[in-house]
Amino acid sequence: MDKKDNIILAFESSCDETSVAVVKNGNEILSNIVATQVASHQRFGGVVPEVASRHHIEQITYCIQDALDEANVDYEDLDAVAVTYGPGLVGALLVGVAAAKAIAFAHNLPLIPVNHMAGHIYAARFIGEIKFPALALLVSGGHTELVYMPEENKFQIIGETRDDAAGEAFDKVGRVMGMKYPSGKEIDELAKTGKDTFNFPRAMEKEDNFDFSFSGLKSAFINTVHHASQIGEKLDKADLATSFEQSVVDVLSSKTVKALGHFKVKQLILAGGVAANQGLRTRLDKELTAFKDVELLKAPLKLCGDNAAMIGAAGYVAFKHGVRADMTLNAEPSLEFEWMVEK
């Protein structure tokens, strides 16, 4: 390795993916090991925290060794250890934090605390350079946020969901339709074949703010399906999927466009698990044609879900800015972005 290179060992365990990665200079993936737990949670229709924690404990050591082996590096090649410490499930977070602290302590390496959502944003570094000021649309199972970044490693939430996250709504709607967890991809594929015939609500779309709400849409969808079931009416699943997805995409895109009109930025970053949705990606491509000076940077499809490579990218940025943690670092399940903004 070139001595000018920064090699970071990164950990991600905030929910139901155990992931360890080795990342060089914040933009090159040397390895990215992901042990998924989807099969274990499918029968419950969602993530069970206790089950997730146990799986992390079982897999973390194997993931560490696999990541080092695939990257062909040893501990002495590392410059730092980065770890997600929030937000997320507390038991799950603790596994990754404990492992990262142990390695940092044993090998006398700097420990870098990383906000999980910052990781999603910086996954875009694997596509290209992030230019500031920037706006990020973060859409996942647990969060839906518009984040303004005036400069590198500075974050300001300008809009967020008042209730359910968009990804959570996708999974609950999928369960009502009899789909397996997680159901976002299946809904997205089905939505390509249907029509928007149900006209589901677009909550808060016209309000003069950048916030979101998806609980009303979720309830309207569930009520529509249940009512049809009670009267023996058969609904077209493709039309249901299209109508639901269009409602979500309409709200996400309209709020993002509104934010772009208020904040002069160089880039719009689309990130998070729902960023893999083709309907949303296509809509933002279309909307950005009206903003000639704004570049759309979309997280790579394979890095939209939870993974440690994105934590390595965010960790590299934090490392450059002198962000460090000591051995008292603990999991913060309700961590927000404000801690990263200089007041």
Curated annotation (Swiss-Prot):
Keyword Cell inner membrane in annotation: no
Enzyme class: transferase
Obligatory cofactor(s): Fe(2+)
Pfam families: TsaD (PF00814)
UniProt-annotated location(s): Cytoplasm
Cofactor note: Binds 1 Fe(2+) ion per subunit.
InterPro entries xref list: ATPase_NBD (IPR043129), Gcp-like_dom (IPR000905), KAE1/TsaD (IPR017861), Peptidase_M22_CS (IPR017860), TsaD (IPR022450)
Molecular functions per Gene Ontology: iron ion binding; N(6)-L-threonylcarbamoyladenine synthase activity
Binding site for Fe cation: H116, H120, D306
PROSITE patterns: GLYCOPROTEASE (PS01016)
A biological process from GO: tRNA threonylcarbamoyladenosine modification
This enzyme's EC code(s): 2.3.1.234
Family matches, as SUPFAM superfamilies: Actin-like ATPase domain
Main location group: cytoplasm
Reaction equations catalysed: L-threonylcarbamoyladenylate + adenosine(37) in tRNA = N(6)-L-threonylcarbamoyladenosine(37) in tRNA + AMP + H(+)
Coiled coil: none
The entry's keywords: Acyltransferase, Cytoplasm, Iron, Metal-binding, Transferase, tRNA processing
GO cellular component, one term: cytoplasm
Job description of the protein: Required for the formation of a threonylcarbamoyl group on adenosine at position 37 (t(6)A37) in tRNAs that read codons beginning with adenine. Is involved in the transfer of the threonylcarbamoyl moiety of threonylcarbamoyl-AMP (TC-AMP) to the N6 group of A37, together with TsaE and TsaB. TsaD likely plays a direct catalytic role in this reaction.
Protein name per UniProt: tRNA N6-adenosine threonylcarbamoyltransferase
Lineage: Bacteria, Bacillati, Bacillota, Bacilli, Lactobacillales
